[in-house]
Amino acid sequence: MTLACLPQTQCPLQRQVSLAKFTTLNVGGCAEWLVEPRTIPELQAAYIWAQEEGLPITVLGAGSNLLVSDRGVPGLVISTKHLRYLTTDLETGQLTVGAGYPLPKLAHHTAKLGWRGLEWVVGIPGTVGGAVVMNAGAHGSCTAQRLVSAVILEPDGTLAVVAARELGYAYRTSNLQETQRLVLQATWQLEPGHDPAQVKAETQKHLSDRLRTQPYGFPNCGSVFRNPQGWTAGWLIEQTGLKGYQIGHAQVSEKHANFILNCGGATAMDVYHLIRYVQTAVADRWAVWLHPEVKLIGNFA
């Protein structure tokens, strides 16, 4: 199969593209096929084409919170990074954003408007689509608290507007995970009318707190493990003596133990083996099994 563009579009269809540059960990093999749609119709066309060809579909936003196998990803990988549109409704205080819009940029934009509600997303290295799927959260807030609805591309290729209450939200999860339902845009309910200077200051404080406590000098995927009930994953890992522990070129961060760093030249298998080692060591010490927040994509057998 040799195609320059998706059928009926001007959207380039690329073959055997390294995904390392599409992830915040800078690891991973090649996508069998890769497409970077700039519009919702192009994304629909990509989805329908993959279904017609019998290809599995993987969606990437900012490439955080995921680990791509060194063996690559079969089928079609859809990058949403160009779906970055944003509209505001000044009367209702609602904000509608494309799935590829970066969360830090969104926080700064709403702060400039004097709209409260998304100050906490400023330090999350992800996109709107990923936040909706994962119920991203920080500083005691999460996506589900402000989300009104999402536009979903359903498995049959149709679009549906789905209310937030129908997305089955819980801690760092939704019923969109492990499905072929794709988030295309989200509408949030914010609180307009505040002093922009004050909202900017609060946003900057959240960012400063994250920069002070979390590692940003090396590639990483964000928090690796979910916090078990009654515990924090970082504390458990630190108390197990694993800060700085390294397999290959992947290392448990000295600054925050719930982060794994690519210290230069790490492979996805280095990271994977380190994740498994940490899980086993913590379970042996505390009888607590750490469940990954990071999503594994591809074959790690």
Curated annotation (Swiss-Prot):
Record key words, sorted: Cell cycle, Cell division, Cell shape, Cell wall biogenesis/degradation, Cytoplasm, FAD, Flavoprotein, NADP, Oxidoreductase, Peptidoglycan synthesis
A Pfam family the protein falls into: FAD_binding_4
Gene Ontology BP terms: cell division; cell wall organization; peptidoglycan biosynthetic process; regulation of cell shape
Catalyzed reactions: UDP-N-acetyl-alpha-D-muramate + NADP(+) = UDP-N-acetyl-3-O-(1-carboxyvinyl)-alpha-D-glucosamine + NADPH + H(+)
Residues annotated as the enzyme's active site: 172, 223 (proton donor), 293
Cofactor names: FAD
Pathway annotation: Cell wall biogenesis; peptidoglycan biosynthesis
Compartments in which it is found: Cytoplasm
Main localization, broad class: cytoplasm
Family membership noted in the UniProt record: Belongs to the MurB family.
Cited PANTHER family: UDP-N-ACETYLENOLPYRUVOYLGLUCOSAMINE REDUCTASE
Protein name: UDP-N-acetylenolpyruvoylglucosamine reductase
